Amino acid sequence: MTAISQPIAQPITEKSNGMPLWRQITMMTWRNLVVIRRTPASVVPGLIISVFFLFIYEASLSGASGFLLGPGQSYLAFILPVSLISASLSGSGVAGQYIVRDIENGYFDKLLLTPVSRIALLSGPVLAGAVILAFQTAVILFVATLMGLQPATGFLGYVAVLVFGVMLGTGFAGFAVSVALLTGSAAATSGASFAFFPLTFLTATFVPLDFLSGWLKTAAQLNPITYVLQANREILLNGWNWEAIGSGLIAVAILGLIPFGIALFSLRQRTTRK
Amino acid sequence: MSSRQIIVENLIKRYEGDFYAVNDVSFLVNAGEIFGFLGPNGAGKSTTITMLTTLSLPTSGKAHVGGFDVITQAQQVRRIAGVALQDIGLDPVMKSLELLTMQGQLFGMSRMDSIKRAKELLELVRLSEFTDRPVGKYSGGMRRRLDLAMALVHKPEILFLDEPTTGLDPASRRDVWAEVRRLNVEEGMTIFLTTQYLEEADELSDRIAIINAGKIAVEGQPAELKAGLGAESINVTFSDLPTAELARSALVDMVDRAQIDRKTLRLYLQKAAYAIPNVVNKLNELNLQPLSLTLTQPTLDDVFLQVTGQRFVDEKEETEEKAPAEAVA
């Protein structure tokens, strides 16, 4: 660590990456955020749809909350995680979209001609995507608060749910990023971020897991999203249930590591000279 | 091995289906030289440049750029080489100052230094007034100039320009030429440029290589190559081919070489101007009436015709073909 902080000239071999990796990553992230800010059209629709879902679900099912949930529990807090997860999934496409954009306009090749680290080329858009996910989640939480949300865990509950949303979306980003790097096609990449949309419905979407039966219950039990959903619900409805939160974190890790393994492989495919 | 040289030995790029885009190409670019790589579309120019600039790997063969092996020392090659590719890769929503500053920082400059360098370069390519406009709103010529500035950020020793003037209007083309000359003379940069314009290769290059169908057809100084054809030519056009044939058999002994191109008889010889009276007398004697008679210095087009047996692609047609593609990009 001390080596990085010393401003002394580095030997030539070190200089091949002129800038420390973390600086390259922050710069690439900043660059992608600038681009996203100038092309907001790619982010706004996903956000609107998620807020719309929240309104519809709440309006159509909140009347049944006394029957579905315990007495006095809010259906809003129960359904909010579904909206957050669908926002994470649609927001996960952002990183892939911006990589494909660079491939199409040729800037990706231009970057490959500089000594920039390949890891920075991947992490820049992914981290920018994470910032967007945090923003989206925060907006949805704000709307939910206006609708009367009062999390059982208070302000920290908001933070925990936000962290879950960002982690889940960032993990899923690996899929769209892989497709972007492998195909260089915008159409294929936007398709990839919808491929996992069914997962949000093969789970305890509208009612608690105990109310499900048959194949849907089996599917929900196998679906890692279920555990993310339950962790969020516990935080918002009941309090710090560490067992549920632990299962949620494991699920998020599984849902993130697999896509990122593929993404690293795809990065290598794209940047290896042929 | 001088640091600003390019040495290419038996370079081959084969694609699937046994298509040889570059087929056993060897050449040497001396330090501080402008080297023109001339050839029609699809001859292998861009493929060569992508290998030399580390974007693609040769199927076989060797290449050293500035003393570094393009295969094993790609990172070092990237540090000393500046590259402006034919397809300008600039993010349309970014602004020129942002792109240049980032480029400088990626090459290891501090933020302050790269801003300073960026402003210097914007001045140089006359874009200082347009730093607030997204690059997507630039004209073709402006984008080309910015792309050149991008290639110069890290003060490269060797500059690669892939068709730097394709799709540009004549005035912008002259600007690029002037800048290329300046970089070569004032900064001592070795410049490797590909072009499909004979005039451009002739005008700019110290030495050229003509590449056709993946192979180098000829290499040398433009003047030397032209001189090698027998200096100048007298071109006599007749009303029909048989008359031209008749004239050739009568005149062939007087000249170094006589060639018929449609209805025109080309007589290649030294000091052609002195020979005109004799040619005219001979034609008079035989009562062969020419439609026109001109004297020309050989051009690279003639060189191309001689080494490949075919005419170079018509430049006008080529520009028109290119124009719509440029507009889309």
Residue ranges and their predicted role:
Chain B
Residues 134-138:
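Conserved ABC ATPase signature
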Residues 159-162:
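Catalytic Walker B motif of ABC-type/P-loop ATPase nucleotide-binding domains
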Residues 178-270, 294:
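ABC transporter nucleotide-binding domain
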Residues 155:
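Conserved catalytic motifs of ABC-family nucleotide-binding domains
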